Amino acid sequence: SLVTLSHTAGQAWAHEGMPPARRTALVAVASTLGIIVPPSLVLLLLGDAMLRAHTEGLTLATQLGLASAHAGTRIINTQDVLQAALAPGALLLVLWMGVTWWLAQRRTGGIADQGAASSAPVPLTRGERWTLGVVPTLIVALLALVTTGRVRAVEAAATAGVLLLVWGVASRQLTLRRLAQVLDDAMALTGALFALLVAAVTFSLVLRAYGTDALVAEWMRALQGQPLLAMGVVLSVLLGSAFVLDAFELIFLIIPIVMPPLLALVDDAAWVAALTLLVLQAGFLLPPLGYALVLSRAQVAPRPAMGAVARALAPYLLCLAGVIALVMTVPATTQWLRSTPATLPEMSIQGDDLDALMREMSHPEAPAPAPAASATPP
């Protein structure tokens, strides 16, 4: 995402005279939107990791006799994480769009001066106008279906892929050379993800063999009764790790170690997942070691000073910090669009009712054969 934005929007902004520091900030900010805005690949992988961590956390809570083991907590799935992250992601997107519009209106250290030369916009062709109208509509429709739970995120992604192939063939823009390049990139990314998964799982097993998970669980047990403090510790670890690890490495390596003890103390795992996504996004943007920030600076020529980039990033980071504080203090922000509760309803079945229910669920006995009718003489 970052490299694509640098070579497309970044070059257009440079042609318009936007300073390098602001181009760097905008590319870094826009490239991290795929972390929190559903249905991103990072969010899907985190949902799967949180499902395993939540299962292990409830098992740990049962072994330690914690209160969360008897709270009737329901194991989360990817759909829960998608719905929990939707409201915070939408709020952050609106705030960042507002900041970008406000900075563009000020034109202070931003777009080129009035006297700067700029080329007139090239009019769109009929095919480009059709593409501009159809593709965003399709994306919004698929996102709406995923958000409402009518289709799974993987199904929506597969549908989009098939429709994109059909559109490429119908518009005669998809050639064999482009198709081969797309398939090659897709296989390279898939292979890299599987290699990263194998390496991360192996490393996690090595750490567990040395008792790292038991040590972390013992530390988190010392914070029993203070779930917010425990969450702050875990989120701080994730924030620091985001300086040197990318999102996939964090999900495959760090989440399986630190999340089960935390989810043994906290009931709402989807709320924790939404906060995790926001903190990862902050770690990628914080100067001077933010992962997205470092990569974005490397794509801009001339390379801007870190101080200028930090000043350009400050409004976006303030908005992100505000959203994190809001979600942490008001967990209901992750529950507005969720279709299923975090806990299961309490049900008590008496002995007689249980016996009756088991009889209803058992196979009915075969009816006795009817007696043969007696033959009548002709």
Residue locations for each model-derived region?
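Alpha-helical transmembrane segments of multi-pass membrane transport proteins
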Residues: 1-378
